[in-house]
Structure formats: C-alpha cells, structure tokens
C-alpha cells in the first residue's frame, strides 16, 4: 500500500459571502469587532472589484492542483491536501484535526506566501504545530520560505517580459518595475526579521532576468493600526518616482502574493492606477500565478524537495 502523506496548504482566507465580512474582520482584529464604518469600507472595496474576492476558489484550485501535480509526478507516496486558513473556516486547527482523523502521521506544510516572517509564516506554522502536538501522533515538516526557488523567479521574469511587450520599444527606457509585498509593522526589524531582505533578494533575482531597465522596491496594503509599517508604500513610491524620473510606464509586480485577491485587484489595479492616471503614466500588471500549471510546478518542486530531504 502506498504511504499517505498530508499536504497542509495554509493561506489567509477570505469571506465566502457578504454575511461573513464582519466575523472575518473580527478575527483579523483579534476578536475586536470592527466599527460599522470599517465594515462599510471593506464592503466598498469588495464592491469596487466586482464582488467578494475570488481568493477562496483560487486557494482550493492551488491546493488540489498541487496535490494532483505531486501525485502524478511520482508513485512513492500519495499526498492528500488539506486547506487550513488563518482567519476563516476551515481554520488551520480544523485542517490538522482532519489529518489526524484520517490517520495521517506525517505531513508537509506550505504557506501560500513565498517569504518568511515571524509575523506571518511563523504564526501559521506555530498554529499547525501546536494543534498537531495537542492531538499527538502527527509530525509536520514546515516549509518556511520558497522565494529562492529558480522556477518561481523565472515564472515572474517571464510574466514581466511578456507584459513589457505591450510597451513601445522606444519607451522601454522610461519604464520602471515596482516589486512589492504586503507591508508589515516596522517593529519586525528590531528582531532581525528576514522578511524585508527576502523581498529585496527576490527583486534582485527577478531584475537580472527582465528587459525592464529600472526597478524599485515598495510595500503595500498596510494595516490601519496606528503604528509605523514598512515603506515606502507603492502609491507614494509611484508619485516619488514619477516626480524624479518622469517614467511613462509602471509595471507593478506584487510578488509577495500568489493570487488575484483584494490586495491586488483593489490596492494595485485600482489605487495604484489612480496614481498613474493622475501623473499621466501607464499602469501595467502581469497576471498573478493563481492556479496556473507553471505555478503549480513551482509549488510541486518546493514540496517534493522538502519531502525528499
């Protein structure tokens, strides 16, 4: 009989329907109920992208697509995918419990975010480990980051180069690539958190492989907590770069994300485009990885390498 290995795929989660918005937001806020204004603001942003974020369906397609890719590429073990979400059901603990019930004794976990941070990925891993320890008999090998995987870098470089084809050749010199990820509270730097450096490395790796002659690093989608977050914010960065260099084309590449969700469809496609329109430049964004076979191959390679070692 083929050995069964759990595949715990963890992600942020998104509301499934309008009624979920309040409890989802309450979970993000550590149990503090948001004000009516906050809920209205979030609802308004979902409305602006045409309804609730497609993230839930994309996460499912990524998890089960990865399971299929792993099982079709070898016959040593059979992987079984379980989705564990941070802010809505199925929660990470629900997924670990389901693995335990299915008699899984060994699992690999991956967070659908390429960069490690004590604030994000570590929090996912800790919840999974705590749940497994409590139940007993289940060992989870966690993947901390996977931004260095050459196939990941190549995938983004190919997408950027494809997007650059839309730009007239004589305007390519006036084009800048903005590489970004979700901002985190600035206090992570006090603990030597590798997150900012990992984004910088990702940008450097990608920049070596693209035809775009300039790039800058930005942060986006920061929380409204009143404390300082990592910057510059992509919108401020756009204004600053235009003011200094008069770039005609801005290519936004939110490499910290892997799907078309609110942070991309609103914070990039709407908010950043407002700024490029304002300064008279053109907005571009390569397609997100979603559940494209090319991206599933990136994840498959990462998981298989972790399992094999």
Swiss-Prot record:
Involved in coproporphyrin-dependent heme b biosynthesis. Catalyzes the insertion of ferrous iron into coproporphyrin III to form Fe-coproporphyrin III. One of its GO terms (molecular function) is metal ion binding. Fe(2+) binds at residues 182, 263. This is Coproporphyrin III ferrochelatase. The gene is cpfC. GO terms for cellular component: cytoplasm. It is found in: Cytoplasm. It catalyses: Fe-coproporphyrin III + 2 H(+) = coproporphyrin III + Fe(2+). PANTHER family: FERROCHELATASE, FERROCHELATASE, MITOCHONDRIAL.
């Amino acid at each position: 009989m083929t050995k069964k290995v759990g595949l715990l795929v963890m992600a942020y989660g998104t509301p499934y329907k309008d009624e979920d918005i309040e409890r989802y937001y309450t979970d993000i806020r550590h149990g503090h109920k948001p004000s009516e204004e906050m809920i209205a603001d979030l609802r308004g942003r979902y409305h602006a992208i045409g309804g609730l974020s497609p993230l839930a369906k994309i996460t499912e397609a990524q998890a089960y697509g990865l399971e299929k890719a792993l099982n079709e590429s070898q016959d040593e073990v059979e992987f079984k995918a379980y989705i564990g979400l941070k802010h809505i059901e199925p929660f990470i603990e629900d997924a670990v419990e389901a693995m335990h019930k299915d008699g899984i004794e060994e699992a690999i976990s991956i967070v659908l975010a390429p960069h490690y941070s004590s604030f994000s990925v570590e929090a996912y891993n800790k919840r999974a480990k705590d749940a497994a320890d409590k139940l007993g008999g289940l060992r989870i090998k966690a993947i901390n980051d996977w931004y260095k995987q050459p196939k990941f870098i190549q995938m983004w470089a190919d997408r950027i180069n494809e997007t650059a084809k839309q730009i007239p050749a004589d305007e390519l010199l006036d084009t800048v690539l903005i590489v970004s990820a979700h901002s985190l509270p600035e206090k992570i730097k006090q603990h030597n958190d590798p997150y900012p450096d990992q984004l910088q490395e990702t940008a450097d790796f990608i920049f070596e492989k693209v035809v775009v002659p300039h790039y800058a690093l930005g942060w986006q989608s920061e929380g409204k907590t009143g404390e300082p977050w990592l910057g510059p914010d992509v919108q401020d960065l756009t204004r600053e770069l235009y003011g200094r260099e008069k770039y005609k084309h801005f290519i936004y590449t939110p490499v910290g994300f892997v799907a078309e969700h609110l942070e991309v469809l609103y914070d990039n496609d709407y908010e950043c485009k407002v700024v490029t329109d304002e300064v008279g430049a053109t907005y571009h964004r390569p397609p997100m990885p979603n559940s494209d076979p090319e991206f599933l191959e990136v994840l498959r390679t990462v998981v298989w390498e972790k399992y094999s070692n």
